[in-house]
Regions:
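Short beta-strand edge/turn micro-motifs at domain boundaries
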Residues: 140-178
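Contiguous segments within soluble domain cores/interaction surfaces
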Residues: 187-189, 193-240
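Short, aromatic- and glycine-rich surface loops/edge beta-strands on solvent-exposed regions
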Residues: 198, 242-262
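Short acidic/polar inter-strand loop motif in beta-rich domains
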Residues: 133-135, 259-268
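Short, well-ordered alpha-helical segments enriched in acidic and aromatic residues
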Residues: 67-92
């Protein structure tokens, strides 16, 4: 048992990189969520079957550019006055993208339009982007899967504003990373108490678990700066926490880190804090 604990503790140094990758998820999810090449003169619509071919074609082009790690090709579709709900700018987004792609050279993007409508000379679209990356030596053999739902405002063929609606990211490593079921509300009111559970689904046998829960405000500066975490020995099959939303509205990253002798899983979800 002591050898198992020592082995788990030696792997802590990987966690700073893992959490840093998670905290940059939004920025690279932004890359290809939705792009629009020209003004579309149509009535308001929520039927994705009516999405203009120019939109779907451009979406495929942006997915391809992001999958190749071509930041310049991606950023040409963002307005110089681009505004993001997390405080990102074109410059900070480019830095986060380049950093992420160095760590995950084999990343793949796939985006689907969920709904869209016209608002005067603008198009507002809601999309879902799936991001995946297989383990490689450059990322410490971490596998990544992320799903990001976002809303874009497009004017004159460029994105002028983007808001992240929801996100979930899973990082895994090792031969047998724990299967973790996370239970977290998507939205709470300021000051409201909430439950955050990360339950290991499979039997552990004689394995020991180390784990930790993280709650962090979402800020542009955190996209580039790694976050360290101290793991504790878990006496039960997961993490069971009670949190309280801050007194001011905003978004938080809530993460669960679970490690066993032959694998690690990190799950991060976005929690929206709204006014009462």
């Amino acid at each position: 048992m002591n050898k198992t604990i020592l082995f788990l503790l030696k792997r802590r140094n990987r966690l700073s990189t893992a959490i840093a990758l998670i905290l940059s998820i939004c920025s690279f999810g932004i890359v290809n969520n939705w792009q629009y090449a020209r003004a579309v003169e149509v009535a308001q619509s929520n039927n994705t079957q009516n999405t203009p071919a120019a939109v779907t074609n451009l979406l495929a082009q942006i997915d391809a550019a992001a999958s190749k790690g071509d930041a310049k090709a991606v950023l040409q579709y963002y307005s110089p006055s681009f505004v993001h709900s997390d405080g990102l700018t074109r410059q900070t987004m480019e830095k986060a993208l380049v950093t992420f792609w160095k760590r995950h050279p084999n990343v793949r993007y796939s985006t689907q339009v969920q709904s869209w409508k016209s608002e005067g000379n603008a198009i507002v679209a809601e999309t879902v982007t799936n991001i995946s990356a297989s383990p490689s030596a450059s990322n410490g053999n971490l596998a990544l899967n992320s799903t990001i739902r976002s809303r874009q405002r497009i004017v004159g063929g460029a994105i002028t504003r983007q808001d992240i609606v929801s996100e979930r990211t899973v990082l895994t490593s090792g031969n047998k990373p724990p299967q973790v079921d996370v239970k977290l509300p998507q939205q709470v009111k300021v000051g409201q108490q909430y439950n955050f559970d990360a339950i290991v689904e499979e039997p552990l046998g004689d394995d020991l678990l180390l784990g930790a829960a993280l709650e962090e405000p979402i800020q542009a500066s955190r996209y580039l700066n790694p976050t360290s975490v101290d793991l504790q020995l878990l006496n039960s099959g997961g993490l069971f926490k009670i949190g309280r939303a801050p007194a001011t509205p905003g978004s938080r990253w809530i993460s669960a880190v679970i490690m066993r002798g032959n694998g690690m899983t990190v799950v991060t979800q976005r929690l929206q804090v709204v006014k009462r």
